Amino acid sequence: MTDTTFIPDYLKPALERLAAARAAHLEQARRMEDTLTAISRAEEQKAELEEDNGSDTRTWRAAFRAGGAMLTDELKSGHIERVARRELAQECHNLTEVLAFERDQLKATCNSTARAFRQAHHAVLSKYAEEELNRALNDTLGPLVRAMVLKA
């Protein structure tokens, strides 16, 4: 026994619009998910950099004081690394802000594509219900009229 689904011709255009709306919405949802993942990754990296930088600052200052406030090559390179980590943390913060703006735009786009998807789904169901009702009325209208004529 084969399972074949018969799709009436009157539903095919509406189903094509539904498939297109679904694909558009899924693409926007995927982009939003990618953006949310990037935001969380950037926040994690920023937190790691800030944590490393905080402990390195204390270590660097302790070494600087212990060395009699003399800047050695090792202390200079340590300072450069600290500054680089601080700037990287700031870049992660800036990236998070940019991605948050992008996320907000994608939310609006997702809302729009979701609405179009729901409307396309409603159109398919409405068209199917309309055709089925018309067919049912046409199938029963003749016998109903005959019964009314016979009764009168």
Regions found by a protein language model. Give the residues of each.
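Short, charge-rich amphipathic alpha-helices with coiled-coil/heptad character
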Residues: 1-32
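Charge-rich, solvent-exposed alpha-helical interaction surfaces
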Residues: 10, 14-17, 38, 63, ...
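Generic low-complexity, intrinsically disordered sequence content enriched
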Residues: 19-22, 53, 75, 148
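Extended alpha-helical coiled-coil "stalk/arm" regions
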Residues: 27-91, 95-124
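A long, low-hydrophobicity, low-complexity, charged/polar interaction segment common
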Residues: 97, 104, 108, 127-152
